[in-house]
């Protein structure tokens, strides 16, 4: 991590796996973490990742609404607030920043390599993999599966409703990730399940 940061700032839905991972990484780096979250249809009950943010010591602001595409606006407001307080935040747009989505997708492709080793140890190959994913997770799984030449069908189950064409965004993340990894692969939205 380059830069003179003293905290991270990111946001998504209240049950975001990405936010949970970001908070855990910040803790490992001895950085404070700030989250801007929307409950949406998930409700306000302290459970799952929303509970883990609390256990991990994240500073959480919950904004009202159900349109997650409004999160970047709220992140910018929180960023300015932290700057005024003298903090030095690393702003991570996560699923809302095009470069962030590609890097996160690549991290999930790397996780697929770990799964590949485990399956080989068990002399097993999955024919289907179901992932709860908004965009980055599924993109990384799709990318990793193709790089590893798996016959596996990746089936995404999105916990989030998006106005944008999410299959096109997943294909974009796959294509940009493949390019960064020098993998000669091409994805279309028709390939995404």
Please place each PLM-identified region on the residue numbering.
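A short, small-residue-rich loop immediately preceding and capping a beta-strand
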Residues: 3-22, 29-38, 125-134
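Active-site-proximal loop->helix
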Residues: 20-65, 164-176
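Glycine-rich beta-alpha junction loops
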Residues: 96-97, 133-136, 158-164
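Hydrophobic beta-strand scaffold residues
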Residues: 33, 60, 89, 152-154
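Active-site/ligand-binding loops adjacent to catalytic centers
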Residues: 152-193
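Conserved mixed alpha/beta catalytic, RNA-binding, or beta-rich assembly cores of soluble enzyme
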Residues: 143-147, 159-160
């Amino acid at each position: 991590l380059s830069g003179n940061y003293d905290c991270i700032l990111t946001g998504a839905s209240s049950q975001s796996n990405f936010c949970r991972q970001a908070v855990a990484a910040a803790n490992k780096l001895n950085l404070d973490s700030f989250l801007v979250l929307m409950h949406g249809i998930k409700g306000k009950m302290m459970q799952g990742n929303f509970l883990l943010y609390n256990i991990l010591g994240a500073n959480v602001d919950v904004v009202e609404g159900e349109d997650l595409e409004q999160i970047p606006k709220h992140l910018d407001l929180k960023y300015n607030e932290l700057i005024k307080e003298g903090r030095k935040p690393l702003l991570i747009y996560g699923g809302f920043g095009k470069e962030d989505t590609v890097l996160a997708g690549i991290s999930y492709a790397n996780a697929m390599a770990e799964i590949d080793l485990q399956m080989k140890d068990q002399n097993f190959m999955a024919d289907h993999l179901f992932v709860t994913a908004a965009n980055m997770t599924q993109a990384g799984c799709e990318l990793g599966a193709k790089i590893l030449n798996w016959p596996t069908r990746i089936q995404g189950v999105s916990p989030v409703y998006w106005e944008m064409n999410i299959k096109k965004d997943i294909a974009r993340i796959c294509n940009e990730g493949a390019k960064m990894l020098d993998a000669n692969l091409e994805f279309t939205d028709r390939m995404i399940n």
